[in-house]
Amino acid sequence: GTSSNANALGISAGTGIPPKKIGKIYGIIKAYTSRVGEGKFPTELFNNVGEKIREQGHEYGTVTGRPRRVGWIDLFNIKYTIMINGIDKIIVTLLDALEGINPIKMCTSYELDGKILESWPIHYEIIENCKPIYKSFEGWEAIPREQWTQIAQEGYGALPETMKTYVQTIKDELKTDYFALSIGPDRKETILMNSGEVW
């Protein structure tokens, strides 16, 4: 769980597998951001959009049932995470949880005192004074669950065009290739972006 060491080095610590025996590192991110507990969260949503994402993404504590904090995807934060973990490819999950939301936003950088930051702040406390810089995207309509399953079976080309634009922009901003996209909770609702790789 996220209470353990969730970075790439935690793989060795948690499994006993030597670092040199680890092959590729895949980073798993949600199509939005969620967080448990206190802490700085520049893209947090406090409105009905946040509530809709929370409901559609089932963002409630597994044990406590408490609502998790949710917000727009924070690519500025994710870029830093990719760098420090040496991530090779990414997997984006819960794209279906953004259905029926328009517009959809993504944070690409932070602004501090009128200046756009080029890299992640050295001091964590600085984030509290940062303002997220957003790109806005046209959303996609709500789709019945069985249709999401059919889309996954047909592959990437069957995704709504607006979702493909959102997904492509994430890739371009992060400068990282995809391993897979998830548009539902079932394994068969996962789209592998390179069928030659083992899932």
Regions found by a protein language model. Name each.
Residues 1-199:
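Non-transmembrane, aqueous-exposed alpha-helical and coiled segments at domain scale
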